[in-house]
């Protein structure tokens, strides 16, 4: 089957924002105005298409990323709506990994908010081109100019308006297009009918000034255009758009648009901007992969190339079972064909291919380079794994996910629930790389760990609804970590003789702190002191032993281990012997490398009326919090601080109490830091 849409006319983009900025409402309006749906669903009514889970409908928030596709001006648009709550940041992470562009949605009253900064950093890490949509211009307190300033100050990027709102709050009724010098006045109806009129006199000077600034900024991306601009020549609309597109694709320029998704004002202009400025799959740098020899390979976005795809999400569908979401980077994948999972070196059959529209599936026969679909039938592929055909053997760059910071114990209410609970936890862990489940070796309890209380609350609720498992839930616990604070060289030797073939493994390892870099294993063996086949078992032995640290049995992180010497026995050495020797070396290091306990530190932003400012500051300090700054916004005070997660349990209730229900806060994981000695002693005592 031939390609129906040229690759140059594809747009793979996501919508990202802080919670309640209006992402899903924007997505719904895009679906409606593109003709994908014919009835507008609202998040506050639980009727939106993209928020299809029961928990999303009840809570009015997005929990899982939802994919769909629409058409606009001869272009095919793959759209992914992502969550705004920090607990579900994994959905943003894996979506941005496979998208070519994004719309960052801001609340016009709030401007840049904490989760805006988080998702912006995620997008920057993957070098995703972005346009910015200042939403809710109809909201009380909406201020476009202040929102643009917050982008420049808090995100530190070149954000330049290409639109100007006419009015704000209840008086917001039009948008000035600075590029084409046109004005659109909206009738307020759901069809978003707009009347083109001349620029009102009171805006003419401002438009002239802002357009000149826009042209000056985009001229930086084209030498000839800059020369024409400096000579005072007229710059064409086509040249301005071409240079904006160039700046956006290079992540050097971020155009700012405005509107009100809820009131159907500015959505069609936003769709025009997606087509005009966000890249197609052929506009972005070629995907990097690595061959069997470890050398870098660039993947060409071509139908004629071998098939290469990345599984970026796994979901469970009650009707068809496992859905594996895949971005196709090159080649063509057909229904009924086979793919190879490179990491697991395993072939799997593609039973069916489907294009998703939220939770609905539309079956297709094939998928081509640059597109996104879901595969039915893959049993062993998980998030972040590369799929290829038999003509190529490469692995795409891996995805990085945050580690859980909070845990709690769960137990089945009845014996009948025991097996069902194990199946449910296994399936949920397959779907969500930031959700972990394990058995506490001391108590035998089943522990679930995630990114926050809401994250775990949703997962427990899903167990009850989707898997019909009733569970008892314990109180939330902090997920502490352990690490080494001092460098030292240690030895691990395992010798076992009991008649017949014995066991022999001997390693010398240098351990040192590796702050914020995770576990790093370095092989410095020379001269065959340890045969190559035993190096990997040494690493595996260390990784297994690091699951339980020397202080209180918490997992170990941020350690560099350099294997520099050792010995072996021609007959008695084995992989198992070297695994055990490595674990003994780590145990010895626990005695000499000054182990320390690390606790998760949360970045919080508290908003309270002026009269509660002092009480709030005092309360944060009493929780071992470090105040990082305060800011006056209208008639409220915003306090930014770093506080240990251990001290934040019950904070919502306390804040509500001393602010008489008028305070609110947002919180997200910041980093791990060494725990004070007094707290360490308390924690170790509870573990004994």
Curated annotation (Swiss-Prot):
Keyword Heme (UniProt): no
Pfam families: EFG_C (PF00679), EFG_III (PF14492), EFG_IV (PF03764), GTP_EFTU (PF00009), GTP_EFTU_D2 (PF03144)
Subcellular locations according to the entry: Cytoplasm
Main localization of the protein described in the UniProt heading: cytoplasm
Binding site for GTP: 17-24, 81-85, 135-138
Domain tr-type G: residue ranges: 8-282
Keywords: Cytoplasm, Elongation factor, GTP-binding, Nucleotide-binding, Protein biosynthesis
Gene Ontology cellular-component terms listed: cytoplasm
Matching InterPro entries: EFG_II, EFG_III, EFG_III/V, EFG_IV, EFG_V, EFG_V-like, EFTu-like_2, G_TR_CS
Disulphide connectivity of cysteines: none
A GO molecular function held by the record: GTP binding
HAMAP family found in the cross-reference section: EF_G_EF_2_B
Task performed by this protein: Catalyzes the GTP-dependent ribosomal translocation step during translation elongation. During this step, the ribosome changes from the pre-translocational (PRE) to the post-translocational (POST) state as the newly formed A-site-bound peptidyl-tRNA and P-site-bound deacylated tRNA move to the P and E sites, respectively. Catalyzes the coordinated movement of the two tRNA molecules, the mRNA and conformational changes in the ribosome.
The protein's name in its UniProt record: Elongation factor G
Organism: Mycoplasma pneumoniae (strain ATCC 29342 / M129 / Subtype 1)
Gene designation per UniProt: fusA
